[in-house]
């Protein structure tokens, strides 16, 4: 399909196969390569941290990698993990996909990610005013991109905090211990 092509939700779901992840980007279905076990284990540990945070802070909800969000561009993105303020789901009714971007998107860099794919995803998040948290497993580095201020970097000995998410505190040494 060409850029600007429209697609129904049902067509989007039928585009891939079970166990495969894909996103709708610039009018085309973009398939995502399977992740390695290290990536997957890191994601499980991250989701556990986010779930623990949400239990203590019910004003937030955490989603794993198959949650689909609509960016300002119209693209459908599936961050590795995300946080969304609960008030964005009236009466806590969670739809099949969100017609909005998450408040915070967590992404784990993969060797198969091309620089252009990463840049396009960052731009989508930026235009949608999403706080982005990018994990580089090789460099053991975390990059936090806010829509309205300079980048922040965290190393594996640091504790990740996000001003807009009071109470969130992730010990990166525990995450990077894999």
Region roles according to the model:
Residues 1-178:
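Gly/Pro/Ser/Thr-rich low-complexity, intrinsically disordered segments predominantly at protein N-termini
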């Amino acid at each position: 399909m060409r850029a600007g092509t429209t697609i129904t939700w049902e067509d989007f779901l039928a585009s891939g196969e079970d166990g495969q992840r894909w996103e709708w980007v610039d009018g085309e279905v973009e398939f995502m390569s399977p992740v390695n076990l290290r990536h997957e284990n890191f994601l499980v540990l991250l989701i556990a941290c986010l779930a623990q945070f949400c239990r203590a802070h019910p004003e937030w909800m955490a989603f794993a990698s198959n949650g689909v969000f609509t960016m300002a561009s119209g693209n459908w993105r599936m961050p590795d993990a995300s946080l969304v303020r609960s008030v964005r789901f009236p009466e806590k009714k969670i739809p099949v996909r969100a017609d909005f971007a998450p408040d915070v998107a967590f992404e784990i860099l993969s060797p198969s990610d091309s620089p252009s794919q990463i840049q396009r995803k960052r731009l989508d998040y930026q235009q949608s005013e999403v706080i982005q948290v990018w994990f580089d497993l090789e460099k053991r580095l975390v990059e936090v991109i806010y829509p309205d201020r300079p980048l922040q970097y965290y190393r594996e000995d640091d504790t990740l905090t996000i001003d807009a998410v009071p109470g969130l505190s992730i010990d990166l040494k525990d995450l990077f211990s894999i």
